[in-house]
């Protein structure tokens, strides 16, 4: 959460960030509910909100460099741009969707897309870090 959240909060301010979290929470669980309308399985967690923060972050800071650990037999540290990281993360969510999983990929994808679009439509300035 704080890898991306603190930067988004700094940009939006505490009040707007709190409102953003509530909106993305409702929208991400809404996507999950629409896709799984007849399911009786409860959903617990805030991963849709975290995904929304990631969507907001990649819109605001697409060129920010992230230090990541890539598994090539051992963990290999490298830096990549935020948009590249988010691209691979988003693709991983689609692969989760293809398999049978107890992970709410619908909330992840919905949260990410709504987070990205909410910030984009709010016309916040992008930063080229």
Language-model features and meaning:
Residues 1-129:
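A detector for small-residue-rich transmembrane helices and their helix-helix packing motifs
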């Amino acid at each position: 959460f704080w890898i991306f959240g603190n930067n988004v909060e700094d940009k939006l301010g505490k009040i707007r960030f709190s409102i953003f979290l509530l909106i993305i929470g409702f929208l991400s669980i809404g996507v999950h509910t629409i896709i799984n309308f007849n399911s009786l399985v409860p959903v617990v967690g805030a991963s849709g909100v975290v995904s929304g923060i990631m969507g907001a972050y990649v819109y605001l800071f697409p060129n920010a460099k992230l230090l990541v650990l890539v598994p090539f037999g051992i963990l290999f540290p490298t830096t990549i741009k935020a948009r590249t990281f988010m691209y691979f993360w988003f693709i991983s969510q689609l692969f989760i969707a293809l398999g049978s999983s107890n992970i709410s990929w619908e909330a992840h994808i919905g949260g990410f897309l709504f987070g990205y679009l909410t910030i984009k439509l709010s016309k916040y300035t992008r930063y080229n870090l």
